Amino acid sequence: MKIICYCGSLRFKKLFEKYEYESVFKGEIALLPCCMFVDIEREYGALSDYKQKADEQHKRKIDICDEVFVINENGYIGESTRSEIDYAIKIGKPVKYMVS
């Protein structure tokens, strides 16, 4: 079973949902950013170090995946996503893009 780690801006929530849904039917395991479907600040209040910890955890997901898939609608890649792509390339993971 293939493990796909999805990366991209959280502004693309609907696209993350779409790709996660499709992964289920392809028999793939989808790894998504932390709390993809919860508004952390609204639900739990400001968490000062949450983003740093979530970013580090997402890199551990990249460590265990077979492939990284970048959700980059209109070619948009933010700073955090760029960091994840650079990390994936550094450790030899294949990286595919929604928009090339």
Located regions from the model:
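Conserved catalytic or regulatory cores that recognize and/or transform ribose-phosphate-containing ligands
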Residues: 1-100
